[in-house]
Design a protein with these regions (language model features):
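C-terminal ends and interior cores of transmembrane alpha-helices
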Residues: 72-86, 91, 174, 288-301, ...
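Conserved MFS/SLC helix-loop-helix module at the cytosolic interface between two early adjacent transmembrane helices
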Residues: 49-88
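Cytoplasmic helix-loop-helix junction between adjacent transmembrane helices
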Residues: 94-138
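Helix-loop junctions on the cytosolic side of multi-pass membrane transporters
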Residues: 162-187, 386-396
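Transmembrane alpha-helix termini and helix-breaking/packing motifs in multi-pass membrane transporters
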Residues: 27-28, 87, 139-162, 231-243, ...
Length: 396
């Protein structure tokens, strides 16, 4: 029953309504591109500095309560953004928005893993999480199309609908309870110093440190750039194919829908992929396959469209596998904080990739920036593998 409610919660989380019109909305409120960039920076900085404290709170007050706090903040923030018409209120709301996701980030996976542990089925984490992502992405595909239509009527409407759908998640969460595995830990006695010690102990393990660099820094950093440059590259490719400029926005809405559907299908089969391919083979092959695709796009730009669909589809499956791998190697006490620490490192790692790729894109082109990212991914992954194989077959 808890897992079915988890799927329902994931469906309310997939609020892609505002995604196709997000930047159009900000421009319509009179914001400059510089101000939009400042909003993104505020979001990332809040994520960076908020991950550990919110993970700690999640370990203290409970996974369910942490998710409840985060979801409530997000729903109110989305409503606020729809009502805003200037930069300063949006800046404050962006900080709140990021904090809402901080409360969710470590606690969601920690709640799911501990719930599965109650039933002695923690090995099913990747499969169940994958199914949850599949539900979220399938709902998101429809939401992207609906959001584009609502935005053509009024750019505020998608934000209001997204706030309403997110608030349904609050109702779902109120019907959930914390797992028995979590309740049996002495979480109320968990001090901040003890929490930092737990994170430090995890990061002193050489293999986990290698995995952190391999996936959370290198792979996550480079593939993040794909999501940043999708729109300008998509526009370049379809215009070269003879599509009229006036059709680009509507095509983007449908491409985002396709993008979500590919992710939904692959996420649904996460468990099958894990059994067939195995975590070790997946992580050893993936960086080099993605790297080859990114470099190939530069020489054949048309390859960008299937490459974007594939990398998007693989991202959620890979995140589920990474969550399974880390969760298998950490204890229940402090779990949310450790997972938040991983997210924090990943958020910090993205910054130099963002700055470097921005300069390269302005100087040459976004396609060239992604090709450079591909070379960095292959070279860095190879170097880490020579130093320490990041994936072990057995838990430890």
């Amino acid at each position: 029953v808890s897992i079915l409610k988890y799927y329902l919660y994931k469906a309310t989380k997939a609020v892609e309504f505002y995604r196709p019109i997000m930047y159009l909305f900000f421009l319509a409120q009179g914001l400059s591109f510089t101000q939009i960039a400042i909003l993104e920076a505020l979001y990332n900085l809040t994520t960076l500095f908020g991950e550990i404290p919110t993970g700690y709170i999640g370990d203290r007050v409970g996974r369910r309560n942490s998710l409840l706090i985060g979801t409530s903040i997000i729903a109110l923030t989305l409503l606020g953004i729809g009502l805003s018409n200037s930069f300063l209120p949006l800046a404050g709301l962006y900080v709140c928005w990021s904090m809402g996701y901080n409360f969710r980030s470590g606690s969601e996976d920690a709640w799911l893993y501990d719930t599965l542990t109650d039933d002695l089925s923690e090995d099913e984490f990747a499969r169940v999480r994958g199914r949850g992502e599949s539900v979220a992405l399938a709902v998101g595909a429809g939401a992207a199309v609906v959001g584009g239509y609502l935005g053509s009527i009024d750019l505020s409407y998608p934000w209001f609908v997204a706030a309403g759908v997110t608030s349904i998640g609050v109702v779902v969460l109120l019907s959930l309870d914390d797992p028995e595995t979590y309740k049996r830990t002495n979480s109320e006695a968990l001090s901040l110093r003890q929490t930092v010690g737990i994170v430090r102990d995890v990061l002193t393990r050489r293999q986990l440190r290698a995995f952190l660099l391999y996936y959370y820094v290198l792979y996550a950093g480079v593939t993040y750039l794909v999501f940043v440059f999708l729109q300008p590259i998509f526009e370049t490719v379809v215009l070269d194919l003879g599509v009229a400029q006036s059709q680009v926005e509507s095509l983007l809405g449908w491409f985002y829908a396709a993008y979500s559907i590919v992710g939904a299908v692959l996420s649904y089969y996460t468990g099958t992929i894990e059994r067939t391919v195995g975590l070790r083979t997946w992580f050893l092959v993936l960086p080099f396959a993605v790297s080859g695709a990114l470099v190939g796009m530069y020489f054949v730009p048309l390859l960008a469209l299937p490459t974007f669909l594939l990398i998007r589809g693989l991202s959620d499956v890979t995140r589920s596998f990474a969550g399974q791998y880390i969760n298998d190697r950490i204890e229940t006490l402090g779990r949310a904080t450790v997972l938040s620490a991983m997210a924090m490192v990943s958020g910090l790692a993205v910054v130099p990739f963002q700055l470097g790729s921005g300069v390269i894109s302005d100087t040459v082109s976004p396609l060239f920036a992604l090709a450079v990212g591909g070379v960095v991914l292959a070279g860095g992954s190879g170097a880490i593998l020579l130093w320490q194989e990041p994936i072990g077959e057995k838990r430890g």
